[in-house]
Each structure stands twice: as C-alpha cells, then as structure tokens.
Amino acid sequence: MEKTMEKIVSLAKARGFVYPGSEIYGGLANTWDYGNLGVELKNNVKKAWWQKFVQESPYNVGVDCAILMNPQTWVASGHLGGFSDPLMDCKECHERFRADKLIEDWADENSYDLGGSVDGWTQEQMKNFIDEKNICCPSCGKHNFTDIRQFNLMFKTFQGVTEDAKNTVYLRPETAQGIFVNFKNVQRTSRKKVPFGIGQIGKSFRNEITPGNFTFRTREFEQMELEFFCKPGTDLEWFTYWRQYCIDWLKALGIKEDEMRARDHSPEELCFYSKGTTDIEFLFPFGWGELWGIADRTDYDLTQHQTVSGEDMSYFDDEAKEKYIPYVIEPSLGADRVTLAFLCSAYDEEELEGGDVRTVLHFHPAIAPVKIGILPLSKKLNEGAEKVYAELSKYYNCEFDDRGNIGKRYRRQDEIGTPFCITYDFDSEEDGAVTVRDRDTMQQERIKIADLKAYFEDKFRF
C-alpha cells in the first residue's frame, strides 16, 4: 500500500476532516476549514498537549493572550526589523518566489548536496548560486529574475477608524511574545518560582509566500507553545529534558520511531537569539517536515522587552539571594501540522480475506474524533440503542448510525478512526449486553450494558 497525500486529502475532504476555505466562492488560496470530524481531532490533540504540558506538569501554568499587541512588542522581538523572506520576481511571467526555496527545490530535483541549510546564506550568495546554476522560473522556465528583496511576513492592519501610522497594529506571527510580556504578571499571581513554564494555544499569522502541502504550511495557523524559564547555566539540562518530553508525547499518541527524527540545527541555521535548536520532524508522504522546534532562546526575549519597555524583567531568587534574567527553553509545536501528522500516521489500507481492502485510521483512542459508534442491528432496536448512546455520550463523543447493513457501518467507522463500535442486537433486549468491536483487531466481545462505562474508562487514557 502506497500512502500518498492525494489519498489522505481525498479522505479528509470526503469524510469531514478538512474542507477548502470559502469553497462556494471559489475558495481562498491555502485556507482550510476543519469539518465535523476535523475539529474533534484537532481539539483532542490540543487537549492531549494541554494535559501533559500544563495540567499534569508540576512546573507549568497556562495563559491565553491577545492576538493584537502594542506594536512596540514587535520592535522588541525583532519581528518588525528582521522577520522577512528573501524574494525575487521573474521578469518574464511576474511570478514571485522565495530565493531559498528555489535553491532547495533545485537541489532536491538534481540530487545536489548544498552542504547544509540555505538559511544562513546571504542574499548575494543566493543570487550568485541561482545565476551560476542557471536555475529557471518554475512557472515559465526562463532565467530572468530581479534582485533579491526582503519581504516582511507580518500581516498589518489598523486599529480604530483612521488608517494612519499611529493606529497600525499587526496580527501576531507567534504566540510566544504574549507570554514574554506577561512573564512578571504570571510569576507574581501564580507564585511560581524559577524554573517554571507558561503554556499557550492560539492562532498566529504569517504572510508566507510559498505555503502548501495541505494544512502543513498555511498563513493562518495554530500554535501550542511553552516558554520555560530557568536559571542561566541550567538551560542545557532543561533543553535536554523538554526535547525528550516532546518525543515521548508523540510516541505515547502513536507516532512510530521510524516516522520521526530529531534534527539539530547547524551553527549557520541557528536564529541569532538561539544557543541551540532541535527540530522534531515527521516523515510525511511529501517528505520530512518540521513539527516541533525546541530552542534555547537564552535571555534574549526578556532582555529585549526590558530594554524597549523600560520595565524590569528580572527575577529575584529569594533562596540564593540573587537577581537574574531567566533563560528560556521553547518547545513550539504547530497544532495543524501535528494534527496532519497524526492523520498521515493513522492512515492505512489493509488487505482482507477474499481480496477486500479496508481503509482504516488507526488513531490513538485519546485523539480519535469519534470514540464509540453505536450501531443498532435493526431500526426496530433503536429505542434500546439510543439509551446506550444517551448514557455514553455524557462521557465520550459517540456517533449513532442505523443506516445500511452492519458490515458497511463498521467500514464507515473504520474509515473515520472510531476505536470501538457497539452493536445493539436482538439478544440485547434479553441479556442486557452488547457486542463491542475493536477497530484494529476487528475482534468482538460481549459486555454488559451496565459495565460499559467502566469498560471504556481505561481505553482512552494515554
């Protein structure tokens, strides 16, 4: 079975995981809406992250910060001055491209070893390489580009009724800065001592020039970020801790060893503020792609906000009787990307006896969008089956389905990743029991209706 993005995207659209955005108006490039199953899957992924990184962690608390922030925030963070992509236009067809992507795509197509990432190259190095290798426009095939220019990735808008400079605001390009500006507030009100972390889930926006690969890279996306504050000198220890914690979280939810890798950034790839960065990447059908960036940001962010705002961002350690600006370890995860990774990892086509093929999503039960399918064997049994549904739906997202033969209903539930199906049959009226079918093994067992809640309690933990 070849696992392709075409198959996964087709299933996602057909079954209600993801729809093209604004579809009745012809769509809007690279926008996607999560459907009835997609929203459940993504919400379950976010709940699983919050559970392990905030709720169960003795170190961390959460916040939910505003998308619009004082523009000085982006001066301090460096986004207004340095958050940009190197762009060049084709003079023949007037298409615009990222210079670094042109080089990387050409290298992939020609099996050329670049000796590392293009991220650290200067504009001059990129332009010279494109000219030397005679890299052509992907749209028209000509080699006639403008010089490279830097294009800021932030979405700019205006607050209030007049569109002038003093009312300019930006849609946040990351959730992290809301955490940094609230560092002192959270530390004071939560009474947390360093080391501690602040987690946040929220939307961010980047005016990417080359988005693509379904929901992997979009201009509007959701992040699950933790900023972990620690004493300088302990940062590498905590970097190692959170790196492994992130890997363990992915494994616990079903990502396999051979589907992911941890890639350390080379010195030329590192952001100017980073002492070290590791990307946890997933092997999508289109190739390796970053899920999680784990960075040692040192004291850069709090120092910058202290300088620009004039507010003291230091922390006083009352046990050691010393004052310092904490270092920050940041594990930053894309909610849309990791949701797509779980979808790709779960997708399978199984050959059954007789040559039949079963399409199934092997989601971990904790993130499956529908936990239990309730299937009466006949519509005459709906009343009893509906009582089972009414009870279990208090605790789990269930789906009631009484249309079609039972075999086809099982296949439908397999295709959307439902871990368990309950069949309410004619014997159920007499013995007070139902048949529970396991999605992965397809094995069935008889369980008393009164015991169902207890039976399922352990099934959905991770």
UniProtKB/Swiss-Prot annotation:
Gene Ontology, cellular component aspect: cytoplasm
EC number(s) stated in the UniProt entry for this protein: 6.1.1.14
GO terms, molecular function: ATP binding; catalytic activity, acting on a protein; glycine-tRNA ligase activity; protein dimerization activity; transferase activity
Alphabetized Pfam families for the sequence: HGTP_anticodon, tRNA-synt_2b
Keywords: Aminoacyl-tRNA synthetase, ATP-binding, Cytoplasm, Ligase, Nucleotide-binding, Protein biosynthesis
Principal subcellular localisation of the protein: cytoplasm
Annotated positions binding substrate: R98, E174, F221, E222, Q223, M224, E225, E330, P331, S332, L333, G334
Record field: catalytic activity: tRNA(Gly) + glycine + ATP = glycyl-tRNA(Gly) + AMP + diphosphate
Places the protein is found: Cytoplasm
InterPro entries to which the protein is assigned, alphabetical: aa-tRNA-synt_IIb (IPR002314), aa-tRNA-synth_II (IPR006195), aa-tRNA-synth_II/BPL/LPL (IPR045864), Anticodon-bd (IPR004154), Anticodon-bd_dom_sf (IPR036621), Gly-tRNA_synthase/POLG2 (IPR027031), Gly_tRNA_ligase_bac (IPR022961), GlyRS-like_core (IPR033731)
Annotated binding of ATP, by residue: 206-208, 216-221, 290-291, 334-337
GO terms, biological process: glycyl-tRNA aminoacylation
Family: Belongs to the class-II aminoacyl-tRNA synthetase family.
Self-association state and partner proteins as the record states: Homodimer.
Main function: Catalyzes the attachment of glycine to tRNA(Gly).
NCBIfam families: glyS_dimeric (TIGR00389), PRK04173.1 (NF003211)
Name of this protein: Glycine--tRNA ligase
Gene: glyQS
